[in-house]
Amino acid sequence: MYKKIMIVLISFFLMLPMFTYAEKVKEKEKEENPRKSKIITIPNAVMNITKENTYPNPTQDVPKLQPSELTQQLINSSKVKIDNPDLIRMLNESTVNSTPFALGYKAIVYLGQWPLNYESTETAPNWEYQKINTNFYDNRGGKSSYQIHYVQESQKKVRGGLTAKIPNAEQVKKMMLVKAAQNSGLSLAFETVVGTGTKKDQVYNIPAKRLGYLYGYAPAVNEKGKVTYGEVYMMLKGSKKSIIVKNVTSQGIGAWIPVQDHVSFEFSASEKTK
């Protein structure tokens, strides 16, 4: 009986490295094959005006901030996920020197209350978020069809924003912008401009005896999710450094984020003035 138990125990311990290796392989596969984002399909009625736009919009791509070795160590020590680029930047700028005489030393430094991460639950487009232009022609006296195309009559600034007041709004907007861009595959910005005189060659035919209307809309995405806040502390214990997060709270939030350099068109022909 004793020999049987010993054989079982030895077999178990021999198999442990195999289980550990299998888990590491799974973790590596997750890292190398992250979940693909859901790319939004752009309808035919929506056109890219990047080349035609007379107002050059600045690129709003938010660069992914790389944490330093110390910052990565601190982030890994936190029980709450940290994605806030402003907090990561502050940690990158911090320097904590270890000393061989630090045995028994302990200190806790309060770094403030921060929005720690944002989790997206929905990214949905509204292709007619804001009306920005109307091209019109009266062809009621005409005997044949008349062609019109899009010409931006005046400069239009399209703004997005959060749907509710929230602490550290600018930091939250940065995290939401990153997630919305990943989920949609679109170029997004909380503010975009369409310049006067912007044109597209696409032709729309107004039949004889009709009024023709070509409406232009600025599209946007409606981003919804949850932001997590917490009080952040840095604990120094001997030569070890770690992050402790206390009083963690979560809050639902939404935002409208315009799509840069895109216009959605709607054409209609009618007998009467609209």
What kind of region is each of these model predictions?
Residues 1-25:
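Sec-dependent N-terminal signal peptides of Gram-positive bacterial secreted proteins and lipoproteins
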Residues 12-13, 19, 101, 136, ...:
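Phenylalanine-focused residue identity feature
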Residues 20, 29, 59, 245-251:
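Short, highly charge-biased, low-complexity peptide segments
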Residues 25-163, 187-203, 213, 219-221, ...:
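Deployable pore-forming modules of oligomeric membrane-permeabilizing proteins
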Residues 143-202, 240, 247-274:
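Membrane-insertion modules used to breach or fuse lipid bilayers
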Residues 169, 208-211:
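Solvent-exposed, conformationally flexible loop/turn segments
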Residues 211, 216, 220-260:
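Domain-length functional cores that host ligand/cofactor binding and catalytic or interaction surfaces
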